[in-house]
Structures are given as C-alpha cells and as structure tokens.
A protein has these predicted regions:
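Phosphate- and other anionic-substrate recognition elements at nucleic-acid/protein interfaces
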Residues: 1-195
C-alpha cells in the first residue's frame, strides 16, 4: 500500500480511495462515521464528518480485489485496508449493511467472511460497529426503502454536495454512514443496533 497525492485528492493504491480534504487528519473528531458496503471484490468505503446538522465527506472510495486473487488474499487485503482507514481517518463509529437474502449459499458465505473481517478489524481497533438493513439505509437517504441504486447515488451526491457522483459501492457506503448519522435522532425508526 502506498499513497500518491494529485492536487487535493489522495489516492491509495489499495483501491483508488479518494480524499476530498487536503489533509484528512487535520479535522479529526469523534463525530466521524465510516460507512462500509462490504463485498469480496469491491468494498465501498465512505468516511463522513458530522458538524451539527451538516454532513461533510472526508473520503470515499473502493477496496478492489482482482478476480485472480484467492479468497485468503482478498480477505487479508480487505483487513489491511480497513485497518489503514481506521488509523488514518479515526472514525468514532463504523456502520455496515446488515445481511440480506442471498439465493446462492456460496455467495452468502463469502459475504459473511468479508463482513467478519471488517467487524474484526474494527473490534481490534476498539471502534464500535453498527448495522442497518439495506431497506433502512434507503429509507434514511432516499425516503423509500425499495429505491434503486441510481436513486441512492443521486441522493448521496446531492445530500453531501459532491461535484461528481461516487461509484455505486462508494455511494452505498456513504449512504450507510448518512443513515448512522441520522440514527441518533431516529434510533427506533432506523433500527440502530451495535454488533
């Protein structure tokens, strides 16, 4: 893993992770939330800063694992990437998407393993993890639990004032973080649950 800086963007070779702040460590607060949209090949990450009623993007991007990599290498890479963003971004909490229905048992097991790696990395760093169902995340961001991917991307871009739309996986991660930011006000409605 190494970093390269291009203008105001920080790119990590672990997955084209974009920073929208000149120096992410300069605005550290316990009101930072890391949203994680877990998958084996393309995990979305979205780090936001809560400032009163305003939400600001600190970083967003993807942890990519090539299709040729074996499962163990993918999980190791995901663990290292999560550890790095936890150390660098210093979120106060992490929010992930809950398990959803999978028709393919193998896919469900692999997703569970990837989620386990994320949860373990957070536990090792002492950062609490909360989970939300995909439906709850969409309700919090779009206002409709069965919203499509395009609607989520559009609302995340609008709510966070982004110049460019993030990738679908990064938008999902940012949506999860937004959902958690609102959970303090609407715990019962959004089903906030520490895991």
């Amino acid at each position: 893993m190494f970093r390269q800086k291009y203008g105001n963007e920080l790119w990590l070779l672990i997955g084209n992770f974009k920073s929208t702040i000149e120096n992410p460590k300069s605005k550290i607060s316990s009101a930072r939330i890391l949203g994680v949209d877990t998958s084996l090949r393309s995990t979305g990450l979205g780090l936001i800063q809560v400032r009163g009623s305003r939400l600001e993007v600190v970083e967003h991007g993807l942890v990519k694992n090539p299709a040729a990599w074996p499962l163990s290498r993918c999980l190791g890479h995901l663990h290292a990437a999560i550890g790095e963003i936890l150390e660098r971004g210093e979120p106060g909490t992490v929010a992930i998407e809950g398990i959803f229905f999978c028709k393919n048992v193998r896919t469900a097991v692999i997703l569970g393993e990837a989620r386990g790696v994320v949860i373990a990395a957070c536990a090792a760093a002492g950062v609490p993890v909360y989970e939300y169902s995909p439906r709850r995340v969409k309700q919090a961001v779009v206002g409709f639990g069965a919203a499509g991917k395009e609607q989520v991307v559009r609302m995340v871009t609008s709510l966070l004032g982004l110049r460019e739309a993030p990738s679908e996986d990064a938008a999902d991660a940012l949506a999860i973080a937004i959902c958690h930011a609102h959970a303090g006000k609407y715990d019962a409605l959004l089903g906030a649950k520490e895991i």
